[in-house]
A protein has these predicted regions:
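DG-centered beta-turn motif at the end of beta-strands
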Residues: 224-225, 295, 340-343, 390
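N-terminal entry segment of metal-dependent catalytic domains or homologous docking segments
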Residues: 157, 169-225, 231, 324-327
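PP2C/PPM family metal-dependent serine/threonine protein phosphatase catalytic domain
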Residues: 112, 184-207, 261-267, 296-328, ...
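Short hydrophobic/glycine-rich mini-motifs in sensory/regulatory modules
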Residues: 130-133, 186-188, 213-219, 333-336, ...
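Active-site-proximal, acidic helix/loop segment immediately C-terminal to a metal-coordinating Asp/Glu
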Residues: 227-249, 313, 335-385, 402
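Signal-transmission coiled-coils
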Residues: 4-162, 166, 219
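Acidic loop->beta-strand submotif enriched in PP2C/PPM serine/threonine phosphatases
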Residues: 201-215, 276, 308-349, 384-385
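Catalytic core of PPM/PP2C metal-dependent serine/threonine phosphatase domains
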Residues: 99-132, 149-151, 155-176, 184, ...
Length: 402
């Protein structure tokens, strides 16, 4: 497997590079070389699993068993190759350290010191596909000192609106920790959720969650378990838990969905086929990636009207490869996205997508919670107040970061 070797660059005046920076560069290069070695091993192992073997047998049962084994080998091989590609990507990322100007470094160090915070190893960080920022090691004897307070200080001192990255510690403590402060995105997303349980049930089979990535993306996840009640809720909850872990580990949306689908397909549990809807919003550009596996239509209300996307794919675990509907849209301030489970649309019965589109188009509210509640109320009223399935409405409204 051919791969471009990863690089680390430390830019600045030669005299500003201290032995610690040189050592960090050498360690990083060694780690990258090891990652590429591991990636090559995983790639070759994956290829060995994917090699096709002639299927022969004396009876129908033995042929079927060998065919199922061949499918399992193919799934395993695909996953190993996916892991190899992620290792390659991480190893190939270019990380740039740019030491702060001496005058600015002293100014920041003194300012933090006056607040009882020790700041060391200050430098600019540049990394492809991740917002640039400032990295520093912070510690304090104070209790309850939040990283957001340090971000506020940097905002005032540097004249740039900064925030702690999602991966940075929440508190500054006695023990020194590394913090990364990145520029605030140009957009702010507000969300609202409204839910209703199926009649006679105490637990919803619908589950939702949100997470923020290091790359400045807000990710919304919505899953509808098979049926309703506790078992359905357990299934959809497991889907979101695994999706969240894979996305946080660095898998992209498509790889995460395929690996999750393969796991459910391999379990071969009849009747357990949850759906998953994913909305990944770039808070710097407004680009919104919508990925749907079995979920009903997602609605986007823009300045020119309301459109609906998808709703034709099958749930997870039915086929060896997930049937994914993927769309890209760019949201602008004042526009909103509405995700929902099938219990909401099914309540509208005939021509449900068009009826829901018209209803959303008529809404004038800007509060996402109010919007979610109005949509849910409309669905419940449309079915005469009888809730025959779990209902969840998930609304995202985009604002400019003033």
């Amino acid at each position: 497997m051919k791969a471009e070797r990863g690089r680390i660059m430390v830019i600045g005046k030669k005299e500003q590079r201290n032995p610690r920076q040189e050592q960090c560069a050498q360690v990083s290069m060694l780690c990258r070389q090891r990652l590429l070695g591991y990636a090559e091993s995983f790639e070759e192992l994956g290829k060995s699993f994917c090699e096709e073997v002639g299927i022969v047998g004396d009876d129908r049962q033995s042929i079927l068993e060998k065919y199922m084994l061949q499918q399992s080998r193919q799934i395993m091989g695909d996953h190993l190759q996916t892991v190899a590609r992620i290792m390659e990507r991480v190893a190939g990322e270019e990380l740039v350290y740019l030491p702060l100007e001496e005058k600015k470094r002293k100014s920041l160090t003194q300012a933090f010191g006056s607040e009882g915070i020790q700041a060391r190893e200050l430098c600019y960080v540049r990394k492809k596909s991740i917002p640039g920022g400032i990295s520093m090691t912070l510690s304090t004897e104070r209790s309850g000192c939040k990283a957001s307070q340090a971000a506020d200080m940097l905002t005032v001192l540097l004249g740039k609106r900064l925030q702690p990255s999602p991966g940075s510690p929440y508190l500054i403590e006695k023990e020194p920790h590394c913090f990364l402060f990145t520029e605030e995105p140009g957009y702010v997303a507000l969300t609202g959720v409204s839910r209703a349980l199926k009649e006679g049930e105490k637990i919803s089979g619908d589950q939702y969650t949100m997470l923020e990535s290091e790359r400045g993306r807000l990710i919304l996840l919505l899953s509808d378990g098979t049926g309703a009640g506790e078992d359905a809720g357990r299934g959809s909850g497991r889907v979101l838990d695994l999706m969240e872990k894979m996305l946080e580990a660095g898998f992209d949306t498509e790889a995460s969905v395929n690996m999750l689908n393969s796991a459910l397909y391999a379990q071969n549990e009849e009747g357990d086929h949850p759906t998953v809807d994913i909305c990944s919003l770039d808070l710097y550009t407004g680009e919104c990636e919508i990925c749907k596996v079995g979920g009903v239509a997602t609605f986007i209300k823009g300045r020119s009207g309301t459109e609906y996307i998808g709703g034709d794919s099958l749930p997870l675990g039915i086929f060896q490869k997930a049937q994914t509907e993927r769309s890209i849209r760019t949201l602008k301030p004042g526009e909103m996205l509405v995700m929902m489970t099938d219990g909401v649309l099914d309540a509208l019965e005939d021509d449900c997508e068009e009826r829901m589109r018209n209803r959303i188009d008529m809404l004038e509210e800007q509060n996402p919670q109010e919007i979610a509640e109005k949509i849910l109320s409309y669905a419940i009223c449309s079915c005469g107040g009888r809730i025959r399935d779990d209902m969840t409405v998930f609304v995202l409204y985009l604002w400019e970061n003033a």
